[in-house]
UniProtKB/Swiss-Prot annotation:
Disruption phenotype: No observed growth phenotype. Increased levels of degP and rpoH transcription; may induce the sigma factor E regulon (rpoE). Loss of about 50% of periplasmic alkaline phosphatase activity; very sensitive to tannic acid. The gene is spy. Changing residue 119 to L: Increased chaperone activity, substrate affinity and chaperone flexibility. Induction: Induced by many sorts of periplasmic stress. Produced upon spheroplast formation, not induced by growth in 0.5 M sucrose or 0.35 M NaCl, nor by mutants that have a leaky periplasmic space (at protein level). Induction is partially dependent on the Cpx envelope stress response encoded by cpxA-cpxR; does not depend on sigma factor E (rpoE). Induction is also partially dependent on the Bae envelope stress response encoded by baeS-baeR; cpx and baeS effects are independent. Keywords: Chaperone, Periplasm, Signal, Stress response. PANTHER family: PERIPLASMIC CHAPERONE SPY. The lineage of its organism: Bacteria, Pseudomonadati, Pseudomonadota, Gammaproteobacteria, Enterobacterales. Residues 1-23 form the signal peptide. This is Periplasmic chaperone Spy. CDD domains: CpxP_like.
Length: 161
């Protein structure tokens, strides 16, 4: 039973670490004439579209946002090859080394923090190119998103019992 539990924990950590590595992975920019993918919802990605909804951005502001986003994409790096190999070595070993796994996870968490910090900095740069009226609308949109509960996609409504 202990081996089964250890295997389950190791698998869970490995899949979680793989998801973190996948989430940190960046993609190359699409050609300018390419249509956005359905889940990307617009020119600026899935969340940027909502951030700037109803703000009536000027062409100059849109260009500035594109430049800021391009700069952020250049900063976002995929985990180094040696980190991905180290993660694979932990997963593929005959025995699970918890200390080694925790050290690898800590290293990945540092990278995730750096990515989140860069993301917040980018959003601040974009916010600061808005006019005062656009900032007011942006803040109203933000408050609206906080108070409204999003509809769950693909889930059936709960039945009353």
């Amino acid at each position: 039973m202990r081996k089964l539990t250890a295997l389950f924990v190791a698998s869970t950590l490995a899949l979680g670490a793989a998801n973190l590595a996948h989430a940190a992975d960046t993609t190359t920019a699409a050609p300018a004439d390419a249509k956005p993918m359905m889940h990307h919802k617009g020119k600026f990605g899935p969340h940027q579209d909502m951030m700037f909804k109803d703000l009536n951005l000027t062409d100059a502001q849109k260009q500035q946002i594109r430049e800021i986003m391009k700069g952020q994409r250049d900063q976002m790096k995929r985990p180094p090859l040696e980190e991905r190999r180290a993660m694979h070595d932990i997963i593929a070993s005959d025995t699970f080394d918890k200390v080694k796994a925790e050290a690898q996870i800590a290293k990945m968490e540092e990278q995730r923090k750096a990515n989140m910090l860069a993301h917040m900095e980018t959003q601040n740069k974009i916010y600061n190119i808005l006019t005062p009226e656009q900032k007011k609308q942006f803040n109203a949109n933000f408050e609206k998103r906080l108070t409204e509960r999003p509809a769950a996609k693909g889930k059936m409504p709960a039945t009353a019992e």
